[in-house]
Design a protein with these regions (language model features):
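Active-site cores that bind ATP or allylic diphosphates and position pyrophosphate for catalysis
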Residues: 108-206
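N-terminal Rossmann-like or analogous alpha/beta NTP/dinucleotide-binding catalytic cores
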Residues: 2-130
């Protein structure tokens, strides 16, 4: 059985990242063949500054290790180091209906909050589908807010398989810890770096 998931390095790691994702990664590394990555291409949709993105990417790698992910048990990698992610995303985009992306909660939520949309944000689910499908995982540990993106991944995989009349892609299942499915931020909304309501993971006692 294989597990795959990732985290954006769009800012300092916060407790929502830990309870919503990384804690699951650590628990699953003794049960599954694990692939966990730093989603630095996804981070470009909200944090395109090169130097800060590079710095944050390194920090998230160190945080993964500090919080218990063991490179002897799981494969850890950076999204941009594997060019096949974007190559597959382009291929998948040609079988992905526009309406499927227009219904994505993440896109609608961010635009409703006044975050200026771009094409990267709109096609985010297609790249996420490529991230997932190229590794044939059985489960995808995600926060509850990402559940729809895994469902979109399944829809894209089904469309691709039907288009080419072959079972090319496995249909992954999301894996969510319901007790911490969505960690609230300081304003009561979902904790998110793009909303500015996070509590950093490694804050001092002060």
């Amino acid at each position: 059985m294989r597990s795959l998931s990732g985290i954006q390095p769009s800012g300092i790691l916060h407790i929502g990242n830990y309870f919503g994702a990384i804690r699951q990664f650590v628990e699953f590394q003794n049960q599954y063949e694990g692939f966990y990555f730093i989603a630095n291409y996804h981070a470009l949709t909200s944090s395109p500054e090169g130097e800060s993105l590079k710095r944050n990417t390194i920090e998230v790698v160190l945080d993964y290790l500090a919080l218990g992910l063991d490179p002897e048990k799981s494969t850890l990698f950076i999204q941009s180091d594997v060019p096949e992610h974007t190559e597959l995303a382009w291929i998948l985009s040609n079988v992905t209906p526009m309406g499927l992306l227009e219904r994505a909660h993440s896109y609608k939520d961010k635009t409703a909050k006044g975050i200026k949309p771009n094409l990267g944000l709109f096609t985010y689910p297609v790249l996420m589908a490529a991230d997932i499908l190229m590794y044939d995982p059985d489960i995808v540990p995600v926060g509850k807010d990402q559940k729809q993106h895994v469902e979109i991944t399944r829809d894209i995989a089904i469309k691709f398989n039907e288009t080419f009349d072959r079972e090319v892609f496995k249909l992954p299942q999301d894996k969510i810890f319901e007790t911490v499915a969505v960690v609230p931020g300081t304003d009561g909304d979902k904790m998110s770096k793009s909303y500015g309501n996070v509590i950093n993971m490694f804050l001092s006692r002060k």
